[in-house]
Design a protein with these regions (language model features):
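Acidic, low-complexity terminal tails and accessory targeting/binding regions
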Residues: 1-2, 80-92, 134-140, 155-194
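Short, hydrophobic/glycine-enriched beta-strand segments
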Residues: 3-9, 143
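Loop-to-helix element that buttresses phosphate recognition and phosphoryl-transfer chemistry
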Residues: 8-62, 111-126
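Phosphate-coordination/substrate-recognition cap region in phosphate-metabolizing enzymes
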Residues: 38-101
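Active-site signature of alpha/beta-hydrolase-fold catalytic machinery across serine-
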Residues: 65, 152, 156
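Internal catalytic-core helix/loop-beta-alpha segment
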Residues: 100-136
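Short basic (Lys/Arg) and small-residue
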Residues: 146
C-alpha cells in the first residue's frame, strides 16, 4: 500500500501577508519558488502511481519545481472558496465579526463566488480520497494543493469531521505523508522540508 503525500504550494504574496486566497491565481514569490524546488530531493525516489494538482498556477508550478510529473489536474483540489473573504485577512474579518472562525462558520458568499462551509470542503476532500484510493495499492499518490483544503483532507482521511482540520497547521512549501499502521490511517510526517 502506498502513502498519500500532500504537497502545499510554495509561498505567494497573499500567503505571506495572511490574506485568504482561493480562486485568485497568484504566482509563487521567489521564496515560494525556492521552497518548491527544495522539495525535489524529498520526492525524487518515491514510486508514484498518481500525481494530481489543483488547477491553480501556484500548485501546478510547485509540482513542476518539485520534480513531480503531474498525471492530472483535479478541480476538487482547489482551495476553500472564501467568497466575500477572498483577499481579506482574519484580523480584518474580526473587526466586523469578532467571533468568526473559518472552521465553524465557513466563508460567506461574495461578488466573485459563493463561499464554502466546512462540510462543502469536506465533501470535495471525500471525492478526492475516493478517486485516489484505487491508485494507492500500486504506489504512492501525491496531491499538490492548498493549505486549508489539505488540512480538511487530512481530517477526512483520519475519519474526523472537516472542522478538525483546524488541528493541523500546514506551512507553505512542505510535504506531509499520510500512511497506514495496522490497517488504520496515520500521519507519518508533517510539514517536512528538505
Amino acid at each position: 500500500m502506498g502513502d498519500l503525500l500532500l504537497v502545499r504550494h510554495g509561498e505567494t504574496e497573499w500567503s505571506r501577508s495572511g490574506q485568504h486566497t482561493s480562486f485568485t491565481d497568484l504566482p509563487l514569490t521567489p521564496r515560494g519558488e525556492e521552497q518548491a524546488g527544495s522539495l525535489a530531493p524529498l520526492l525524487a525516489d518515491r514510486p508514484f502511481a498518481l500525481v494530481l494538482t489543483s488547477p491553480l498556477a501556484r500548485a501546478v508550478r510547485t509540482a513542476a519545481l518539485a520534480g513531480l510529473k503531474a498525471t492530472g489536474v483535479d478541480p476538487d483540489l482547489h482551495e476553500w472558496h472564501y467568497g466575500a473573504y477572498e483577499g481579506v485577512t482574519t484580523e480584518e474579518i474580526h473587526r466586523t465579526r469578532p467571533d468568526w472562525d473559518l472552521w465553524t462558520d465557513g466563508a460567506p458568499p461574495g461578488p466573485d463566488g459563493p463561499g464554502e462551509s466546512p462540510e462543502e470542503v469536506g465533501k470535495r476532500a471525500d471525492r478526492v480520497l475516493a478517486r485516489v484510493a484505487g491508485a494507492l495499492p500500486e504506489g504512492d499518490v501525491a496531491l499538490v494543493a492548498h493549505g486549508h483544503f489539505l488540512r480538511v483532507l487530512t481530517a477526512r482521511r483520519l475519519g474526523l469531521p472537516p472542522s478538525e482540520g483546524r488541528l493541523f497547521r500546514l506551512e507553505t512549501g512542505t510535504v506531509c505523508r499520510l500512511s497506514t499502521e495496522h490497517g488504520r490511517p496515520v500521519i507519518a510526517e508533517w510539514n517536512t522540508r528538505a
